[in-house]
Amino acid sequence: MIALIQRVRRAEVRVADRVTGAIEAGLLALVCAERGDSEAAADRLLAKVLGYRVFSDAAGKMNLSVQNLDGAGRAGGLLLVSQFTLAADTNSGLRPSFTPAAPPDEGKRLFDYFVAAARAKHPIVETGEFGADMQVSLVNDGPVTFWLQTNA
């Protein structure tokens, strides 16, 4: 599975002009399941997303995770948005191939699993809508962006 995480001051996702998820300071994670991914891969990726130290401590060092945004235990928001295009094969030609992405039904199942697991482990989880045409707005903080990937 893949997650492109961005440290944000705020972010929201809309579907048909309706806000489906919004957060203040925290992480926006674009999430993609690849062919052959499993719940175990989703669990490993979620552990990375929740524990990845991308927020600055008092010394200005990236030493804090979304679960401890300010060093005093305050959790930040986590906005999860499905994005199958992260699995694109761009090695040949000028048109991406999405063959590496999980089929839609499997991608939805794993994304839903990822969201449920996140909600069980983190207090502030918002989402987009799987398979929908979404508009994502964010104020990137830094910018700080990382590509996280786990293998099946």
Curated annotation (Swiss-Prot):
Main function: An aminoacyl-tRNA editing enzyme that deacylates mischarged D-aminoacyl-tRNAs. Also deacylates mischarged glycyl-tRNA(Ala), protecting cells against glycine mischarging by AlaRS. Acts via tRNA-based rather than protein-based catalysis; rejects L-amino acids rather than detecting D-amino acids in the active site. By recycling D-aminoacyl-tRNA to D-amino acids and free tRNA molecules, this enzyme counteracts the toxicity associated with the formation of D-aminoacyl-tRNA entities in vivo and helps enforce protein L-homochirality.
Subcellular location: Cytoplasm
HAMAP family: Deacylase_Dtd
Complexes and interactors: Homodimer.
GO process terms (BP): D-amino acid catabolic process
Chief place where the protein resides: cytoplasm
Alphabetized SUPFAM superfamilies for the sequence: DTD-like (SSF69500)
Organism: Paraburkholderia phytofirmans (strain DSM 17436 / LMG 22146 / PsJN) (Burkholderia phytofirmans)
Source organism, top-level taxon: Bacteria
Keywords: Cytoplasm, Hydrolase, RNA-binding, tRNA-binding
Domain topic, free-text comment: A Gly-cisPro motif from one monomer fits into the active site of the other monomer to allow specific chiral rejection of L-amino acids.
One Pfam match: Tyr_Deacylase
CC per GO annotation: cytoplasm
Name under which the protein is recorded: D-aminoacyl-tRNA deacylase
